[in-house]
């Protein structure tokens, strides 16, 4: 009996110790500040990324701009189309599939996670990176995360296509990834693109009926490790979240004259970078004349619920969403007819130059 008590006490001690260690490890990734240094793109690349690309985006929209409520046949077709657009020579594709309870019963959700590869790198989780002096760096490659949701909201009363919400953002991200493949191939940094499932509520928005995919993936990535090697070829494990420099979410894009504001002081420098790129492209007349500036250099408090929320405590987040929302939001008018080609092209150019400046 005496030994049994000792065994129980020792077991409880080790259980508590492990939990304390886990808490310490998780606290290390909370409240990160953005410290990204962007490089200036050559004029040839700026011109390349400023070329008209609406035809390519429309090609993607043709496949995505359908009713695509989570766990339906159309939804599966859209998922398969998105996956098919990423060349596996350049990208690793992971699917995060899981089941969750909804007001309409148990549903299956699938997040799509696409991550750029290094040249001749077959294993993302076992990476060697060389410094200029020839030594192997023990630092894992830094990662920029871009994201949007690919499901559409269920409405009993009408067919909802969700052009801005978020067929256009998904199409823009696919086009961006393909356009930047040559820069991605040479970059020492990683680009991760996440297509979230289950952003929309099936009935009324709540903590349990919304953000199904992002809530699941945010917790899953807490345990993800990136393995690098030191100069003695010994493995070093780092938390995935410690490698993420910023998490950017696109939503409700495509209607004319959107205005974007800063919602998060921690990513103010990223927002200002987008604003500066817009100004430079406007001066060069690479984007269309417009009534107002897209990226307004003003901070406003926001409690907008979206797929960035589950990641707030782990990585710096930048939420790119018009404020106020487009007047077609969650109506049957959020279809192809509400879209403005000039606005979509302009934003696409700005995002490409932003990401290109990060990768080089």
UniProtKB/Swiss-Prot annotation:
E.C. designation(s): 2.3.2.5
Cited InterPro entries: M28_QC (IPR037457), Peptidase_M28 (IPR007484), QC/QCL (IPR040234)
Pfam families with a match to the protein in the record: Peptidase_M28
SUPFAM superfamilies given in the database record: Zn-dependent exopeptidases (SSF53187)
Similarity annotation: Belongs to the glutaminyl-peptide cyclotransferase family.
Glycan attachment residues as annotated in the record: 135
UniProt GO molecular function: glutaminyl-peptide cyclotransferase activity; zinc ion binding
Keywords linked to the UniProt accession: Acyltransferase, Glycoprotein, Metal-binding, Secreted, Signal, Transferase, Zinc
CDD domains recorded: M28_QC_like
A GO CC term assigned to this protein in UniProt: extracellular region
Function field: Responsible for the biosynthesis of pyroglutamyl peptides. Has a bias against acidic and tryptophan residues adjacent to the N-terminal glutaminyl residue and a lack of importance of chain length after the second residue. Also catalyzes N-terminal pyroglutamate formation.
Name of the protein this chain belongs to: Glutaminyl-peptide cyclotransferase
Active site: 199, 251
Catalyzed chemical reaction(s): N-terminal L-glutaminyl-[peptide] = N-terminal 5-oxo-L-prolyl-[peptide] + NH4(+)
Compartments, record wording: Secreted
């Amino acid at each position: 009996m005496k030994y049994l008590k000792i065994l129980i006490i020792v077991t409880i001690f080790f259980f508590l110790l492990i939990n304390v260690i886990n808490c310490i490890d998780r606290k290390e990734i909370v409240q990160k500040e953005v410290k990204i240094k962007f490089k200036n793109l050559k004029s040839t690349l700026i011109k390349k990324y400023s070329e008209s690309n609406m035809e390519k985006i429309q090609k993607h929209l043709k496949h995505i701009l359908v009713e695509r409520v989570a766990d339906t046949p159309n939804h599966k077709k859209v998922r398969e189309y998105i996956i098919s657009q990423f060349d596996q020579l350049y990208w690793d594709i992971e699917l995060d599939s899981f089941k969750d309870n909804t007001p309409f019963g148990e549903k299956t959700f699938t997040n799509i996670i696409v991550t750029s590869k290094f040249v001749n790198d077959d294993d993302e989780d076992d990476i060697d990176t060389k410094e200029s002096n020839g030594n192997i760096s023990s630092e894992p490659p830094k990662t920029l995360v871009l994201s949007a949701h690919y499901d559409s909201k269920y409405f009993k009363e009408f067919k909802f296509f969700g052009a801005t919400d978020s067929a256009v953002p998904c199409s823009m991200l696919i086009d961006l990834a393909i356009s930047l493949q040559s820069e991605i191939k040479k970059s020492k940094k990683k680009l991760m693109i996440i297509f979230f499932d289950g952003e929309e509520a099936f009935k009324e928005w709540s903590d349990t009926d919304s953000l199904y995919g992002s809530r699941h993936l945010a917790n899953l990535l807490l345990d993800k490790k990136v393995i690098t090697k030191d100069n003695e070829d010994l493995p070093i494990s780092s938390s995935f979240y410690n490698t993420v420099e910023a998490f950017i979410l696109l939503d409700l894009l495509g209607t004319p004259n959107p205005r974007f504001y800063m919602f998060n002081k921690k990513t103010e420098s990223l927002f200002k970078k987008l604003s500066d790129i817009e100004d430079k492209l406007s001066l060069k007349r690479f984007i269309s004349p417009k009534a107002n500036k897209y990226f307004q250099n003003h901070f406003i408090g926001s409690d907008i619920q979206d797929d960035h929320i589950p990641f707030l405590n782990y990585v710096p987040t930048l939420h790119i969403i018009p404020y106020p929302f487009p007047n077609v939001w969650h109506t049957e008018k959020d279809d192809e007819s509400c879209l403005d080609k000039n606005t979509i092209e302009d934003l696409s150019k700005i995002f490409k130059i932003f990401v290109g400046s990060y990768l080089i």
